Amino acid sequence: MISIIGIGNSASRIAEKFKLQNNYEIYLLGSDYENSKNSFNLKAFENPEEYEKNIPNLKSFLKNANQDVQVFITGSSYSSNYALGILEQIKEKRIEVFYIKPDIDLLTGIPKLIENAVYGVLQEYARSSLLKSFTIFSNIELEKSLSNISIKNYFDMINQAIFSSVHYINFFKYAEPEIGQISKPLEINRICSIGALDIKNMSEKWFFELDSPRETCYYICINKDRLEKESGLHKKLVDMLKEKPRNAFRKVSYGIWET
């Protein structure tokens, strides 16, 4: 069981997607939510300083949270000012943070300052081993990867893509592949990105571009019929993977699962 925490209304919309699955316990925090067993009303203020002065005590609310916690935070949102204070209250947990980065070119004023501050501090948390991992999604890159995305369904499709990506990574961690082995990332490599893979040519569409990736893990899903009948498929895939950039500082691993 993994506990999912959404900090703020936007992040909680993503967290709500996990209700469709059985292996998660969901905690929603935002000004749109009423106090209940799994939701907490966060007060909204006009300036960031007020958030820092009014960090809620969530120890009772989160007392039954699992040891493995995945926290969703939306960059530039005023509610992200609560994030550091909330993370401090669950610091004994194994915390994975998923950060949704907005289009910073169009940010101005206070939202831009908030985004810069929270994004920078969370990276330092990851580098200091206070977080198990810090995974970044870019709204810009997600939009590029999605077809039929309109203004009306923009955020729902973005949220669905984030949910699907995280859920399947969680699934792969606990399900044995048909063949191959995903290497465990080194402790030092805590800042991550996720992307979509076209297995026809092994081309990637990253949902955030890391500057210097040190490890790349390929999770390959193939239907049962192809796995059973297509001879030479494994060699074909492995040969393409061997053409990927790799050296002593950049490792590549893979696994193949049945869909």
Task: Please provide the spans of the model-predicted regions.
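Tubulin/FtsZ superfamily GTPase core signature
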Residues: 1-259
